[in-house]
């Protein structure tokens, strides 16, 4: 939807993205961080598309940490393009209609090869997802802040992490089921530690 903003603002955003890629690429190499871009690239200037692709190729072998940047991205677009991909496979006869399920959809969605989103931080005082990562953030914890993105500090990021750590993630289960699962996990871990002679603090 951001393509609907004034042309001058869109052009400025594209320029800033190009500058950011140039400035940050050496840091990506230094810290071995992969860089990837998700979204519909059809409306992005060709020169910037080429720059994005080059950055992805240069950092493709860095898989321990990946920085994913959404450009021209929308959650509904993402699900539609995933559905088209699967529909094409069905039409081509390489996928049976009965095989289309959540797992297949996950494989076709953007970031499908990465774990689901655990924490989604929304800056700028807006209390909505704005069509962002609708599939990937299905079970994400949400953190909203009035702080604008350029002023979002490491201290506030740590605060978001701290609040995230206090939340109980149930994934459809009851609180009692979660606690029972945690107790079972702790008991199993203690038993394994005792058997191996290890101690944990």
Locations of regions flagged by a protein language model:
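Flexible, compositionally biased loop and terminal segments
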Residues: 1-201
């Amino acid at each position: 939807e951001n393509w609907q903003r004034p042309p001058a603002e869109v052009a400025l955003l594209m320029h800033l993205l190009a500058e950011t890629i140039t400035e940050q690429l050496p840091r990506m190499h230094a810290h071995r961080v992969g860089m990837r871009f998700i979204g519909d690239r059809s409306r992005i200037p060709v020169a910037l598309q080429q720059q994005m692709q080059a950055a992805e190729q240069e950092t493709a072998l860095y898989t321990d940490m990946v920085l994913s940047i959404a450009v021209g991205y929308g959650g509904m677009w993402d699900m539609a393009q995933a559905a088209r991909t699967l529909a094409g496979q069905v039409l081509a006869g390489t996928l049976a209609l009965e095989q289309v399920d959540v797992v297949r959809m996950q494989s076709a969605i953007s970031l499908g090869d990465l774990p689901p989103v655990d924490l989604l931080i929304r800056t700028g005082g807006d209390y909505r997802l704005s069509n962002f990562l609708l599939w990937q953030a299905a079970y994400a914890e949400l953190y909203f802040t009035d702080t604008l993105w350029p002023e979002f500090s490491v201290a506030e990021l740590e605060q978001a992490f701290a609040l995230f750590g206090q939340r109980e993630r149930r994934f459809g289960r009851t609180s009692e089921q979660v606690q029972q699962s945690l107790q079972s996990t702790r008991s199993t871990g203690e038993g394994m530690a005792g058997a191996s002679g290890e101690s944990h603090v």
